[in-house]
Amino acid sequence: KLLDDLGVEAVIDRKAAGYRFWADEHTQDEGEWRRLGKDVRAFVGDDPDIVFEHPGRSTMGASVFICKRGGTVVTCAATAGYMVEFDNRHFWMKLKRLVGSHFANYAESWQANRLIQLGRIQPLLSAVHPLAATGEAARTIHRNEHEGKIGVLCLAPQEGLGVDDPELRQRIGEDRITLFRRHGG
């Protein structure tokens, strides 16, 4: 229900599908990459132009493989290991690009904030904690027990005190702003 409310059209759950991109700790399984590619194409009709890669070692080979010829793999982390490995033939022979990203620079951050102020995008919080509970909030993130974003109130005793455009907030709607919380995030 949460994903439907966010407008997600298709989801492939790696765990539920049982993908094993590594046959053992030294050998990747190209057959599993092909299976993932087939599943992606079944949902969207083509190979993806852009693949957002987060886990790192466990999935980089598959991400490079399924990315469309001339497409881009964007990596923004490496939670499953920083030492990635992939078959370079699937990279250079198909003219793919690899882009590293760590969110944004100052100008991009300013533009993202501007889009928030215009109501074009809405940051979705699953939980907000008082400053005294920062340790618990960090522990929740460290254990990956959260969905979406978590906020910490630094200079405010309660939520809502930083709202400087109530009309925009009303236009966006509390139901959209609190979407993750309503779904038990």
List where the protein language model places each region.
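Adenosine-nucleotide cofactor-binding segment
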Residues: 1-58
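Terminal peptide-recognition signature
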Residues: 3, 51, 63, 98, ...
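Short, acidic/turn-prone active-site loops that include or flank metal/cofactor-
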Residues: 14-20, 77-81, 103-104
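C-terminal hydrophobic helical "lid"/dimerization subdomain
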Residues: 35, 46, 61, 106-185
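Short SAM/SAH-binding signature in class I
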Residues: 48-52, 71, 149
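Helix-to-beta-strand junctions that scaffold the AdoMet/dcAdoMet cofactor pocket
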Residues: 67-68
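Glycine-centered, small-residue-biased loops immediately flanking beta-strands
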Residues: 71-72, 96
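Rossmann-fold NAD(P)-binding glycine/threonine-rich loop
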Residues: 78-95, 106-112
